């Protein structure tokens, strides 16, 4: 076993190694998946007069990932969800911050229905008050980080993972630029917020086009194979993050217990 190659290979890139058993993402016993239709296993059915949209949570990438890791995943998501709607009631409705649903890690995959709306203000980290989320601006950035802050309010030690938008799919003209801004915002938030990591599917994931795109999409949403692939990518990305930042995750087992303040000694 080559420990250096497994944990400290500087040439390894995220998703170079695709895991099917969750890998080191399995160090988390609970995940909260905050998102929209693509976090909800939504299938789209073609029909004349308007397509049908149906959330099949058992097919969501979160539930595929839970089955891989042997962990518990909570779907705090719904088709069409935005950061604004989440804060205006859905977060409470779905029980995101209920004591019995508090998670060790939260994976936030929101933004498609927010930033692709013409005229939507994406905002910047300057829109965020780290001391009082009630002062956050009414931009996507302000609302998105408020969701993060409320997660940290109920679980101060939770690890947060922010997902960028893959390339391809059904983006229309001009929307790729918005998705690029969203990608940069995720990095800016992670740097500002702390204990937060970016799952950059836009940079390291595949482009959803051609034969591949047609194979994993069903109309405008992913099919079962597409959601399974997404679960493998997100689990593999978290596996990569944990392996390359072992010190950051030494006390994961204490998250949500009375031992959260125990200091981890250094080895000589």
What role is predicted for each listed range?
Residues 2-77, 95-97, 247:
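Serine-esterase "nucleophile elbow" of acetyl-processing enzymes
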Residues 37-40, 78-84, 112-117, 166-170, ...:
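Solvent-exposed loop/turn segments at secondary-structure junctions
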Residues 40-56, 79-85, 124-134, 219:
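Acidic/histidine-rich helix-loop elements
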Residues 58-60, 86-100, 145-150, 184:
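Alpha-helical scaffolding within the catalytic cores
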Residues 85-138, 168:
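Oxyanion-hole/transition-state-stabilizing segment in secreted/luminal serine hydrolases
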């Amino acid at each position: 076993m080559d420990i250096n190659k497994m944990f400290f290979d500087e040439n390894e890139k995220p998703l170079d190694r695709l895991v099917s058993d969750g890998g080191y993402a399995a160090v988390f016993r609970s995940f909260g998946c905050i998102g929209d239709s693509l976090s909800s296993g939504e299938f789209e059915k073609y029909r004349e007069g308007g397509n049908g949209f149906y959330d099949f949570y058992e097919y969501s990438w979160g539930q595929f990932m839970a089955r891989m890791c042997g962990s518990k995943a909570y779907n705090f998501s719904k088709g069409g969800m935005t950061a604004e709607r989440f804060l205006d009631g859905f977060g409470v409705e779905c029980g995101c911050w209920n004591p019995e649903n508090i998670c060790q890690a939260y994976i936030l995959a929101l933004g498609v229905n927010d930033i692709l709306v013409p005229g939507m203000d994406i905002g910047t980290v300057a829109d965020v008050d780290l001391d009082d989320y009630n002062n956050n601006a009414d931009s996507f950035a302000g609302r998105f980080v408020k969701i993060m802050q409320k997660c940290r309010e109920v679980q101060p030690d939770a690890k947060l993972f922010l997902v960028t938008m893959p390339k391809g799919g059904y983006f229309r003209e001009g929307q790729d630029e918005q998705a690029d801004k969203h990608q940069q915002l995720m990095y800016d938030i992670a740097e500002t917020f702390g204990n937060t990591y970016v799952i950059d599917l836009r940079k390291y994931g595949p482009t959803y086009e051609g034969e591949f795109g047609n194979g994993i999409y069903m109309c405008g949403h992913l099919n079962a194979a597409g959601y399974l692939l997404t679960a493998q990518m997100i689990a593999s990305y978290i596996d990569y993050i944990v392996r390359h930042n072992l010190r950051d995750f030494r006390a994961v087992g204490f998250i949500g217990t009375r031992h959260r303040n125990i200091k981890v000694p250094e080895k000589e």
